[in-house]
């Protein structure tokens, strides 16, 4: 184990354990998966229009990951799954995939207790199974939160079927991290990498709006929700949500104006702009911002710590909060 001492926590970092990949390779082809090994690069898989990989060593090999973390000056990664999650699988297989992934998170933490923690995945498309996995995973070593897509098989997070799961997560005291998988209008976003560049941030905004207008945040006042990609479109378009609330009677059912929900969320730094990070600080506050990288995808920050520490408009206290203190408090480190 590396003995380097850093004070930076990356909350947006993806991980594919070999045990999880083995299950996809074995069972995926029977459920619409195309799975292949790209020579010299690792496995690549496709489900519908979602293509993932090649999944290189940094996604799988914990020692390779720790080496990168040391090079970046990062103390800890909060490990999470990426597309296509487990929602493609029927109940029993989805449960097995989730348990396999979350058990791998626990083993990673036990191997590197100061460096690696986990955000547990859930078979939330099967809410009864998800409820059981919330209970089980919350007790695993190193699990510090839960990870859910911004929509699940076409259902938005305001769907009543998901409410019991969110209630159980709230009761656990652990935060809920969101991440896009399917994106709105993907047929128009296939060119120019727009599925990621535009589709993902708009998905985050739509998910936030559903949690607000769907009453989820009102019903669950202690639920902590973390948005990726600096909140996507949500913090930038909250004025439009506010205007709709002011002018439309059918939006008056929520307890307060949409802008008042900005601080119900946390936001990572994966916005790729000094201006975005400054906006989050000015409008929401540095105490709600968490450092992220999007490792180990090619779009990830090479120097996620420096993005914050070199920011010209943030003071030393704000930088400490974003790089380390907020995540340490939220994830109980």
Residue ranges and their predicted role:
Residues 1-333:
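Helix-coil boundary/capping segments in enzymes
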């Amino acid at each position: 184990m590396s003995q380097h001492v850093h004070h930076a926590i990356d909350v947006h970092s993806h991980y594919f354990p070999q045990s999880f990949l083995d299950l996809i390779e074995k069972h995926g082809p029977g459920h619409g998966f195309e799975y292949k090994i790209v020579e010299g690069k690792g496995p690549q898989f496709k489900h519908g229009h979602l293509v993932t990989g090649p999944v290189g060593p940094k996604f799988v090999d914990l020692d390779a990951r720790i080496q990168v973390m040391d090079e970046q000056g990062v103390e800890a990664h909060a490990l999470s799954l990426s597309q296509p999650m487990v929602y493609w699988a029927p109940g029993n297989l989805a449960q097995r995939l989730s348990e396999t992934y979350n058990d791998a998170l626990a083993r990673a933490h036990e191997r590197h207790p100061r460096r690696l923690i986990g955000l547990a995945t859930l078979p939330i498309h099967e809410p009864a199974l998800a409820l059981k996995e919330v209970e089980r995973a919350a007790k695993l070593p190193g699990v510090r939160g839960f990870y859910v897509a911004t929509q699940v098989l076409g259902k938005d997070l305001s769907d009543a079927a998901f409410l019991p799961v969110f209630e159980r997560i709230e009761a656990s005291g652990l935060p809920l991290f969101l991440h896009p998988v399917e994106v709105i209008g993907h047929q128009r976003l296939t060119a120019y990498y727009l599925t990621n560049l535009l589709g993902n941030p708009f998905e985050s905004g739509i998910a936030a709006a559903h949690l607000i207008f769907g009453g989820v945040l009102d019903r669950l006042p202690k639920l902590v929700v973390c948005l990726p990609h600096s909140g996507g479109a949500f913090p930038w378009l909250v004025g439009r949500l506010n205007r709709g609330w002011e002018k439309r009677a059918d939006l008056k059912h929520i307890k307060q104006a949409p802008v008042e929900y900005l601080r119900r969320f946390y936001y990572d730094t994966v916005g790729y702009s000094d201006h975005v990070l400054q906006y989050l600080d000015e409008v929401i506050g540095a105490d709600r911002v968490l450092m992220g990288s999007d490792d180990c995808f090619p779009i990830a920050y090479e120097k996620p710590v420096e993005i914050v520490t070199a920011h010209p408009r943030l003071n030393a206290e704000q930088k400490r909060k974003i790089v380390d203190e907020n995540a340490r408090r939220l994830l109980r480190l």
